[in-house]
Design a protein with these regions (language model features):
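Outer-membrane beta-barrel porins/channels
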Residues: 2-187
Length: 187
């Protein structure tokens, strides 16, 4: 179940304020058990190893959750067209376990000349990211039976997941992409 709750307040002059709180989830995955066999140093002297877990670092799991608060102002014009704008505030939480075996492919490992394993890749608990964006919308009657709607949401610029800076590109950057919707309603 993904929560969604909203409240609106009608104002004078055909305008209104609204608050909407909603969440997104779905990247809750787990890979339990299994083994991974690999050669840790390629043609080097280390032997081939079989280690527990999907990627050789124990059980693997990933979780991403997002929560949004839209603060909206809308106005209905004399011709029946409604326009709206919203500030979108966002929070994300992310956690991953069991991917430490990929440490040799990270930016921080390469920057150390291959001498230090990354500390911002796996098994660091829940990390939080916060950000904001904008949403614009239009709702217009085309006839007595048909209405048209369009919405555009800008990219939501987020703070970085510092605890997982070696996992994501751009040192933990995980912005939420822009969104565009268009539709018709038939009465």
């Amino acid at each position: 179940v993904i929560p969604h709750i909203a409240k609106s307040w009608q104002l004078e002059n055909n305008s209104a304020w609204a608050l909407a709180f909603y969440g997104r989830g779905g990247m809750n995955t787990e890979w339990d058990g299994g083994t991974a066999t690999f050669d840790p140093d390629g043609p080097g002297p280390a032997p081939v190893m079989t280690l527990p877990g999907t990627y050789g670092s124990g059980d693997t799991s990933m979780n991403l959750s997002q929560a949004f608060l839209d603060i909206t102002w809308a106005k209905k014009l004399d011709n029946g067209v409604s326009l709206g704008i919203a500030a979108v505030l966002a929070a994300q939480m992310f956690e991953v376990e069991g991917v430490a075996a990929f440490g040799g492919y990270t930016r921080s490992f390469a920057a150390s000349g291959g001498t230090q394993m990354p500390t911002a890749l796996s098994n660091n608990g829940t990390d939080w990211s916060y950000g904001a964006g904008l949403k614009f919308g239009l709702h217009a009657p085309l006839s007595e039976r048909v209405t048209f709607g369009v919405m555009y949401q800008t990219e939501t610029f987020m703070t970085e997941f510092d605890d997982y800076a070696d996992l994501f590109a751009e040192q933990g950057d995980f912005d939420i992409p822009a969104d565009f919707k268009i539709g018709l309603t038939f009465k």
